[in-house]
């Protein structure tokens, strides 16, 4: 890239490189001058990240527990109907059972008794 054609771009690039080098130099100088302090600060930073991850995991588990303690749908939703050749997903089976096999579906009272026993 020619500096005569785009002096602004080359100036911007050189300024950016200078800032980058001075920042790296300052960081290296600080680490060399205060190795103990730098190690302590890095250790604290790593511990904070670990604590943050643990808090996030605990919070996520509590959120999952709250979802599991929410009111559940009636037990008839989970009961498996006895079918000899069952190869369909639940929604197909529900539709078929609602018309042809009403006698096999227990009432809510019977299901509540089964759940409590």
UniProtKB/Swiss-Prot annotation:
GO terms for cellular component: host cell endoplasmic reticulum membrane; membrane; virion membrane. It comes from the Viruses. One of its GO terms (biological process) is symbiont-mediated suppression of host innate immune response. Keywords: Glycoprotein, Host endoplasmic reticulum, Host membrane, Host-virus interaction, Inhibition of host innate immune response by virus, Membrane, Transmembrane, Transmembrane helix, Viral immunoevasion, Virion. Residues 96-117 are annotated as: Disordered. Signal peptide: none annotated. Induction: Expressed in the late phase of the viral replicative cycle. The chain crosses the membrane at residues 39-59. It is found in: Virion membrane; Host endoplasmic reticulum membrane. Glycans are attached at residues 12, 97. It is a single-pass membrane protein. Interacts with the minor capsid protein M1249L and with the hexon capsid protein p72 capsomers; these interactions form a rigid zipper structure that stabilizes the capsomers. Interacts with host STING1. Belongs to the asfivirus minor capsid protein p17 family. Together with the penton and the other minor capsid proteins (M1249L, p49), forms a complicated network immediately below the outer capsid shell, stabilizing the whole capsid. Three copies of p17 encircle each p72 capsomer in the inner capsid shell, anchoring p72 capsomers on the inner membrane. Required for the assembly of the capsid and icosahedral morphogenesis. Additionally, inhibits the host cGAS-STING pathway through its interaction with STING1 and subsequent interference of the recruitment of downstream components TBK1 and IKBKE. This is Minor capsid protein p17. It comes from African swine fever virus (isolate Warthog/Namibia/Wart80/1980) (ASFV). The lineage of its organism: Viruses, Varidnaviria, Bamfordvirae, Nucleocytoviricota, Pokkesviricetes.
């Amino acid at each position: 890239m020619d500096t005569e054609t785009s002096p602004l771009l080359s100036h911007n690039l050189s300024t950016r490189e200078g800032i980058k080098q001075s920042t790296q130099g300052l960081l290296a100088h600080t680490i060399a001058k205060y190795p103990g302090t730098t190690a302590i600060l890095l250790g604290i930073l790593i511990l904070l990240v670990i604590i943050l991850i643990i808090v996030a995991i605990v919070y996520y588990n509590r959120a999952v527990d709250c979802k599991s303690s929410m009111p559940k749908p009636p037990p008839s939703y989970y009961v498996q109907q006895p079918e000899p050749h069952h190869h369909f997903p639940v929604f197909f089976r529900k539709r078929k059972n609602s018309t042809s096999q009403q006698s096999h579906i227990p009432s809510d009272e019977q299901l509540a008794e089964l759940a409590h026993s």
